[in-house]
């Protein structure tokens, strides 16, 4: 008793960890038996106390933390600030997400710590506290949810939801919080189920691979070891953990004194001596060599000394112990346990939390600014990054502190700044250890409002989306969404016109209907058309073409902005350029009218190629009346035979295209002769490599036609016309109604009579239906699905025009002259197969006869019915029927002029008109023919027109550099049916204007429309100038990109911004009486050339102008590079004008000075009041779609005071983007936006929302694109730390064990193995190279793998002894593959054999065996053992047994599993002795070791000789353990 009283008494509660430590010390001191006795007493005491305490848990025991309220409030305040920064565009979405997660995570963690101390101080006996912190049940994070806050949760994809749950379970959750928290719960339930199974299977595989590893001998005699040294940055704790329980491989000396001998096991005492020695002489201490399972020389078992102490009782492991199975279970078991903790605390971004350096005292901080450069932190804050270790001094009042900041750290304060004590001054980049837990994640940012996209830097194409509309940002910059108000209603009349609003004045006052094509904005918007005219007049919109405006009324022109990036191009002289003036009707000059159906067409980006058509003239004389469908016949004056024959051959397949095109073509004929340029539709892809494709979102349809690269193309195409209208208006009809050429569905009819009409064949199922009222919609909709598959790459050569890269060119090669042509009426109906006809085949009917239930005929005549597989064709031929006596003498298909008698017919009478004679065969009779005589309308071609009659004189004076030619062509294929709907006209002949030039080196001509307004006159000019383009462009299938020329290899943003460059000029409605002409314009108005530096505009002055003889000269005061020339509208007053382009120059504020020549100042008085200019941030012209309305409430007015104006001259310019809260003048800017009106005393902002985007972010869409709310705007790719709960950890462990490729492991390891395999044999030669190379490779990879696995478990707080992992890794890496380099007599190439076996075989045979190290996974290693019974019981039973039988394998039953399967005694424990026979070899062990030492010394010499090479080529002599946690260095002491 007296003795006991002297013992120290500790009055202190202990937790689970303390008990663990106590037990291990008890075992060390007293051994197993006595310890178990003590623990029994503790157990009894525990149960007794628990019973008497009788813990109960009620809701009142859940005490919330008092400080929670203000902590949460503080976090909310920070979040609010963050939102504001985001709104101002100061941080981008990822930075915002990161910071918000970290703010809430820190709050949550702080609360967790508070909770612990709060319980301890206020209520230490609280049952919640007792339970959770005793380690009995529940853990801190679960209690934290009960009484702290739940914090951030992950969604089912593992992404953070950045809305934290602020309540705890005691307070109760709101509905939103409840739903968010259910995510985690669901994920937890699923994970627990799935992962438990995974973990169990992992354990099974691990045990499988090492079940035969048993301790069978005391010593294997190895002399290899692995060196451990605390010098390599290893922590003391790890050093101790690594050494305790191991066996030394070599003697250890301190100075000359040996303090530990070889084969001695290391206990805590020895380790402490090592540590003391290292501390005393850190640089002289030698590394400690230990034995590990890796160095054991046995193949299928392990020796006591290589294994070391048994973890259970602290002595050397006993013989006969199944250490393999223990290892497998030790690794697998934590996995099974950890899957039950799948609770997500959600610290997603915390894996890379940085260490902070704080200021030691108040004072002024100083550092060398040359050694740092500015950067952004992960949270978007400004900081300095230091290149090298930086020395920072903090000067307080009486003391100078100096702080060292390691390299690559971020300094968060400025030089000479005053810092307070404990203020964070720097952030150390988190160590490389977190590297492997990073993953790349995409974050999509969606637009928060409708608007127009602008960006403030150049962009380039994402290489993998070369042909898409995705772009990459080369530097951090802002994207702006400029607010617009979409006008989607077609008849909405806006009464929003107020003073100083920008409106398209005439757009909404015109009667008629406007259909805006929003395909520019996004293809997903479904467009609804408001139908004002009823079914008949339904418009069909083609959604694939870019910005097109269709109207039945008149429309204001809109203008392309075609500017080069380098203004020098504009500054050339007048040569290579001409200007075409467009004329207004004088009374209605607000409407632009092109009389006589002249249509101008400027191709995409305004670039014309040689021989391009740029204007059409539809002569009313060649317009067909509304009589209906029919056939056009004509003769060529020079008709080459080869064309003729091939044309016959193709005629049948041409039929469907033609008719369908014709049928649509006239639907808009009265209202509109101008359609979108078809150059989108036909594209050649001639020189693919040569053309850079940079177009953006104009999707091309060039794939709708088949390309035939031979010279003639499809010959039928030569005879086709440049029929633009129907295709443009209705989408390309070839796409919708196309024949399926590849599918063999053509029958070429042999009947002579059918051949004559080029009848449509089977392929045309729904390709063209007549557009009667009933089938009109069907034919458009149904056929689209069936024939929507476009064919690639087509080139169309129509009637001598070659489609070349999107513009139509005139080719002399195929030009033919036609003197007259004829139109013959005929009707065709395509009816569904099932329809019941009311007329018979070969019957003769009158006009308006009922054909089917709801179809009536429009012509009278002969009916022919032809039934096809899928439909019925019904043709009606008008005309008289004759039965001639000598049918053979009649030439079918001939045209007979008037006044000629027809002798063969029964009657003979004079004809006033031409007739067309056809021969028809009577059915079921081979000889009998009848003749159909059909009336024909003749049209003569007029050769009288020439340039002089159509174009003004001063245009012709340009001919020295650009030539214009007129060409007539016929719009229809010879003898092809033109199907019509009946309330429209059809144009037979078109006259087109072709532009050409001589200079070979010029690539193309650029065309642009210029509109110039003065007080009472608005004039428009088409300007064409020759340009030598750097890169021509073509389009490709599904090409959504569009950027024009790229001068100097960078994007030209004016081009991306330009409209679909095409003037809309409506034809005159028939009832208007005034006829002016675009071509011969009224000579009353003198024209005046104003030659600015760009020398490109012509301005028609108003009547009786005072300045008829204005000077033609440049103003020398304007620097050439600083002016864009007069490319805009000079607006008389702001109250009414259209959104076209406005005047601008580079010297923004000086708008009213120096702009024009002095003597023009009076004329342009309007400049004094110039209110509007539109430019983008880089001072390029910006433009609006005609469908954007700027509403008044989007504009913010800011008034400048005169005193502040002078200072801000440098700051404000038009088009500049300004962020909210910027302090420009005395007041702050209240809203972000773009300046687009600058007055003397105020400016107007157009509201805009900035989004910050980082380098490499992907921008969706193109400059100037219209976005809708919710459209995807930018995609960021950022790295985040994986939330390293075991749900991610376990799969990773499994991947490493399976040697499967994972992000960070395999590239390094595989590369390293390759390097070793290659370099070592090269250095050392054969056979040493292979032997040593394979060994070093295996050693490297083993240690690397052990590290990676340990890292995953340690991150979870799980301690597993290295030796367990080593035993498994040893099995995974113990095989080599025999290579094909040297054929050996022993092994087959590709065979897997053990490394030791290969070495022994090589030594025994005295010949070199070539092999390479290989990394097997645990599954493959389990299937490559010495026991086929073990393999078969694992996987693929039948295959394994069959192979074993074929090979005649013998199983020696050395492992546990084989014996269990066969019911024998297992060779461990008590059954061990039966299997181990003392071999006579053991007596000779000493001599063996002697011999081996001889062999080893040779190898050692070789290694030392090549030390430098080895170490420079690899990481071997460097940090063996790769990471800072466990550095090992393998040295082979041989």
Curated annotation (Swiss-Prot):
Name the predominant localization.
Answer: plastid
Tell me what reaction this enzyme catalyses.
Answer: RNA(n) + a ribonucleoside 5'-triphosphate = RNA(n+1) + diphosphate
Q: Name one GO cellular component term.
A: mitochondrion
Q: What is its EC number?
A: 2.7.7.6
Cite the record's Acidic residues compositional bias ranges.
Answer: 744-762, 770-789
Start and end residues of each stretch annotated as Disordered = 644-698, 719-800
Task: Outline what the protein does.
Answer: DNA-dependent RNA polymerase catalyzes the transcription of DNA into RNA using the four ribonucleoside triphosphates as substrates.
Task: Spell out the subunit comment.
Answer: In plastids the minimal PEP RNA polymerase catalytic core is composed of four subunits: alpha, beta, beta', and beta''. When a (nuclear-encoded) sigma factor is associated with the core the holoenzyme is formed, which can initiate transcription.
The family assignment reads: Belongs to the RNA polymerase beta' chain family. RpoC2 subfamily.
Protein name in the entry: DNA-directed RNA polymerase subunit beta''
Q: Which organism is it from?
A: Saccharum hybrid (Sugarcane)
Gene transcribed to yield this protein: rpoC2
């Amino acid at each position: 008793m007296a003795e006991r009283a002297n013992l120290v008494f500790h009055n202190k509660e202990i937790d689970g960890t303390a008990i663990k430590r106590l037990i291990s010390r008890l075992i060390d001191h007293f051994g197993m038996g006595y310890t178990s006795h003590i623990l029994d007493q503790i157990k009894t005491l525990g149960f007794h106390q628990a019973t008497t305490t009788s813990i109960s848990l009620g809701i009142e025991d859940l005490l919330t933390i008092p400080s929670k309220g203000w902590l949460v409030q503080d976090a909310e305040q920070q979040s609010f600030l963050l939102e504001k920064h985001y709104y101002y565009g100061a941080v981008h979405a990822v930075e915002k997400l990161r910071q918000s997660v970290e703010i809430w995570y820190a709050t949550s963690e702080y609360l967790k710590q508070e909770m612990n101390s709060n319980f301890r101080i206020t209520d230490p006996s609280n049952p919640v506290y007792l339970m959770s912190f005793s380690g009995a049940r529940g853990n801190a994070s679960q209690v934290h949810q009960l009484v702290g806050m739940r914090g951030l949760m992950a969604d089912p994809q593992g992404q953070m939801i950045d809305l934290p749950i602020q309540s705890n379970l005691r307070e109760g959750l709101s509905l939103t919080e409840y739903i968010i928290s259910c995510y985690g719960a669901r994920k937890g339930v699923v994970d627990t189920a799935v992962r438990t199974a995974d973990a169990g299977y992992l354990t099974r595989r691990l045990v499988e691979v090492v079940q035969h590893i048993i301790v069978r001998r005391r010593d294997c005699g190895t002399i290899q070891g692995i060196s451990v040294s605390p010098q390599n940055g290893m922590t003391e704790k790890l050093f101790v953990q690594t050494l305790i329980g191991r066996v030394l491989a070599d003697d250890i000396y301190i100075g000359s004194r040996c303090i530990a001998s070889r084969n001695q096991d290391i206990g805590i005492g020895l380790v402490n001596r090592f540590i003391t020695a290292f501390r005393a002489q850190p640089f002289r201490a030698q590394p400690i060599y230990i034995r590990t399972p890796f160095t054991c020389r046995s193949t299928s078992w392990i020796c006591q000394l290589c294994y070391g102490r048994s973890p259970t009782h602290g002595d050397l492991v006993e013989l006969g112990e199944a250490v393999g199975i223990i290892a497998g279970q030790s690794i697998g078991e934590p996995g099974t346990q950890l899957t039950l903790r799948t609770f997500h605390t959600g610290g997603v971004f915390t894996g890379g939390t940085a260490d902070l350096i704080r200021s030691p005292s108040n004072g002024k901080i100083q550092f060398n600014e040359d050694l740092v450069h500015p950067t952004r932190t992960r949270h978007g804050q400004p900081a300095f990054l230091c290149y090298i270790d930086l020395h920072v001094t903090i000067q307080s009042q009486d003391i100078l502190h100096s702080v060292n900041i390691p390299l690559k750290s971020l300094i968060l304060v400025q030089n000479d700044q005053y810092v307070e004590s404990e203020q964070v001054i720097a952030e150390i980049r988190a160590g490389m250890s977190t590297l492997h837990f990073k993953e790349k994640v995409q974050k999509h940012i969606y637009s928060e409002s409708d608007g127009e996209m602008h960006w403030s830097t150049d962009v380039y194409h994402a290489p993998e989306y070369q042909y898409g509309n995705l772009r990459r940002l080369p530097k951090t910059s802002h994207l702006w969404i400029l607010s617009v108000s979409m006008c989607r209603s077609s008849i909405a009349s806006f009464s929003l016109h107020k003073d100083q609003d920008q409106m398209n004045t005439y757009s909404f006052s015109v009667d008629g209907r406007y259909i805006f094509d929003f395909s520019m904005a996004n293809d997903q918007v479904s467009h609804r058309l408001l139908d004002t005219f009823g079914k008949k007049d339904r418009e069909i919109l083609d959604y694939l073409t870019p910005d097109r405006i269709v109207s039945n009324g008149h429309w204001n022109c809109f203008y392309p902005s075609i500017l080069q990036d380098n203004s020098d191009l504009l500054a050339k002289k007048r040569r290579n350029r001409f200007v075409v003036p467009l004329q207004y009707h004088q009374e209605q000059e607000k409407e632009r009218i092109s009389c006589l159906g002249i249509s101008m067409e400027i191709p995409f980006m305004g670039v014309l190629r040689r021989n391009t058509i740029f204007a059409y003239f539809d002569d009313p004389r060649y317009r067909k009346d509304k009589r209906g469908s029919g056939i056009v016949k004509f003769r060529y004056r020079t008709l080459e035979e080869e064309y003729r024959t091939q044309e016959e051959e193709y005629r049948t397949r041409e039929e469907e295209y033609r008719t369908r095109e014709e049928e649509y073509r006239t639907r808009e004929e009265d209202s509109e002769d101008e359609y979108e340029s078809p150059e989108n539709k036909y594209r050649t892809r001639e020189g693919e490599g040569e053309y850079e494709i940079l177009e953006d979102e104009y999707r091309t349809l060039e794939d709708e036609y088949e390309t035939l690269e031979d010279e003639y193309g499809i010959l039928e195409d030569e005879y086709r016309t440049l029929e633009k209208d129907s295709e443009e208006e209705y989408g390309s009809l070839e796409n919708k109604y196309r024949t399926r050429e590849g599918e063999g569905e053509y029958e070429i009819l042999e009947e002579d009579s059918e051949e004559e009409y080029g009848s449509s064949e089977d392929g045309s199922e729904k390709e063209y239906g007549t557009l009667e009222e009933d089938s009109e919609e069907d034919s458009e909709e149904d056929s689209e699905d069936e024939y929507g598959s476009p064919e690639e790459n087509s080139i169309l050569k129509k009637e001598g025009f070659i489609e070349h890269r999107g513009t139509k060119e005139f080719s002399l090669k195929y030009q033919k002259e036609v003197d007259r042509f004829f139109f013959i009426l005929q009707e065709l109906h395509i009816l569904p197969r099932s329809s019941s006809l009311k007329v018979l085949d070969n019957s003769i009917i009158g006009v308006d006869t009922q054909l089917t239930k709801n179809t009536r005929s429009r012509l009278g005549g002969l009916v022919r019915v032809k039934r096809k597989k899928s439909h019925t064709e019904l043709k009606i031929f008008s005309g008289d029927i004759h039965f001639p006596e000598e049918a053979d003498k009649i030439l079918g298909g001939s045209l007979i002029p008037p006044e000629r008698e027809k002798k063969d017919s029964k009657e003979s009478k004079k004809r006033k008109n031409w007739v067309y004679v056809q021969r028809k065969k009577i059915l079921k009779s081979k000889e009998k023919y009848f003749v159909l005589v059909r009336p024909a309308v003749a049209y003569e071609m007029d050769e009288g027109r020439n340039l002089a009659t159509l174009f003004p004189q001063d245009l012709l004076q340009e001919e020295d550099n650009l030539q214009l030619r007129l060409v007539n062509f016929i719009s229809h294929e010879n003898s092809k049916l033109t199907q019509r709907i009946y309330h429209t006209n059809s144009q037979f002949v078109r006259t087109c204007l072709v532009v050409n030039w001589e200079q070979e080196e010029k690539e193309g001509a650029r065309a642009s429309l210029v509109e110039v307004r003065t007080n009472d006159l608005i004039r428009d000019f088409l300007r064409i100038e020759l340009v030598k383009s750097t890169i021509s462009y073509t389009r490709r299938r599904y090409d959504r990109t569009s950027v024009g020329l790229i001068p100097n290899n960078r994007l030209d943003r004016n081009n991306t911004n330009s409209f679909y460059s095409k003037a809309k000029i409506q034809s005159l409605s028939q009832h208007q009486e005034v006829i002016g002409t675009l071509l011969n314009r009224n000579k009353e108005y003198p024209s005046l050339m104003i030659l600015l530096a760009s020398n490109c505009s012509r301005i028609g002055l108003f009547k009786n102008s005072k300045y008829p003889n204005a000077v033609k000269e440049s103003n020398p005061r304007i620097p050439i590079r600083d002016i864009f020339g007069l490319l805009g509208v000079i607006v008389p007053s702001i109250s009414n004008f259209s959104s076209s382009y406005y005047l601008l120059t580079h010297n923004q504020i000086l708008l009213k000075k120096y702009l024009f020549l002095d003597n023009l100042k009076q004329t342009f008085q309007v400049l004094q009041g110039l209110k509007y200019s539109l430019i983008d941030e880089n001072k390029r012209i910006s433009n609006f779609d005609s469908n954007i309305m700027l509403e008044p409430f989007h504009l913010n007015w800011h008034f400048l005071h005169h005193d502040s104006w002078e200072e801000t001259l440098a700051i404000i310019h038009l088009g500049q983007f300004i962020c909210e809260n910027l302090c420009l003048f005395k007041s702050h800017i209240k809203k972000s936006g773009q300046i687009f009106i600058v007055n003397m005393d105020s400016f107007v902002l157009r509201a805009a929302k900035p989004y910050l985007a980082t380098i490499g972010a992907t921008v969706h869409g193109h400059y100037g694109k219209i976005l809708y709310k919710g459209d995807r705007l930018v995609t960021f790719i950022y790295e985040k730390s994986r939330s390293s709960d075991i749900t991610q950890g376990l799969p990773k462990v499994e991947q490493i064990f399976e040697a499967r490729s994972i992000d960070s492991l395999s590239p390094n390891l595989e590369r390293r193995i390759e390097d070793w395999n290659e370099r070592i044999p090269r250095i050392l030669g054969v056979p040493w190279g292979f032997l040593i190379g394979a060994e070093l490779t295996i050693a490297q990879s083993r240690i690397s793998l052990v590290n990676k696995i340990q890292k995953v478990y340690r991150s979870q707080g799980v301690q597993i002894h290295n030796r367990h992992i080593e035993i498994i890794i040893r099995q995974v890496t113990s095989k080599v593959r025999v290579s094909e380099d040297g054929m050996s007599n022993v092994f087959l190439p590709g065979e897997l054999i053990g490394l030791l076996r290969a070495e022994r075989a090589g030594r025994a045979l005295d010949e070199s065996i070539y092999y390479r190290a290989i990394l097997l996974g645990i599954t493959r290693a389990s299937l490559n053992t010495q026991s086929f019974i073990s393999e078969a019981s694992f996987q693929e039973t039948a295959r394994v047994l069959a192979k074993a039988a074929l090979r005649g394998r013998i199983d020696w039953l050395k492992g546990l599993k084989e014996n269990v399967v066969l019911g024998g005694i297992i060779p461990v424990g008590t059954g061990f002795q039966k299997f181990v026979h003392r071999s006579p070899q053991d007596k000779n062990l000493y001599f063996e070791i002697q011999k081996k030492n001889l062999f080893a010394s040779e190898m050692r010499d070789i290694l030392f000789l090549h030390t430098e090479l080895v170490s420079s080529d690899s990481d071997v002599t460097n940090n063996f353990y790769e990471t800072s946690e466990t550095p090992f260095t393998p040295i082979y002491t041989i």
